[in-house]
Amino acid sequence: MSLLSNMISIVKVGYNARHLQVIVQNSKLCINVLSVLYKLGYIRGFIIKDQKNITILLKYINNKPAVRNIAVISTPGRRTYLKHKKLEKFLTKKDSGFLILSTSKGILTDEESNMFKIGGEALLKIN
């Protein structure tokens, strides 16, 4: 299991158990994804404890998790790459969510990658 998949699994369990914080393994990719989630207001923040661990401060709105659903799209066994023209088709109009992509400009949301007109590896889908 990749570190990103492991982090998402721990975050899901933390939200289901109503924890205020969870601890995950440290990696550059996880820090970049957490930075995007923090910037968009889906977590209260994160603290890099040491070289091995990150504490994620989970966010609740009216006693409900800020993240309704989070899913890993690209796995080590099956990478999913999207061109910027295909991004709109990937999310249906009913979805209020967004994608997090790994691009040549770094970790971006689908809106940001559309602005830059670049595609990339689809990492996560968040509602």
Swiss-Prot record:
It comes from the Eukaryota. GO terms for molecular function: structural constituent of ribosome. Gene3D superfamilies: 3.30.1370.30, 3.30.1490.10. InterPro entries: Ribosomal_uS8, Ribosomal_uS8_sf. Keywords: Mitochondrion, Ribonucleoprotein, Ribosomal protein. Its main location: mitochondrion. GO terms for cellular component: mitochondrion; ribonucleoprotein complex; ribosome. One of its GO terms (biological process) is translation. It is found in: Mitochondrion. Belongs to the universal ribosomal protein uS8 family. PANTHER family: 40S RIBOSOMAL PROTEIN S15A. This is Small ribosomal subunit protein uS8m. It comes from Acanthamoeba castellanii (Amoeba). The lineage of its organism: Eukaryota, Amoebozoa, Discosea, Longamoebia, Centramoebida. The gene is RPS8.
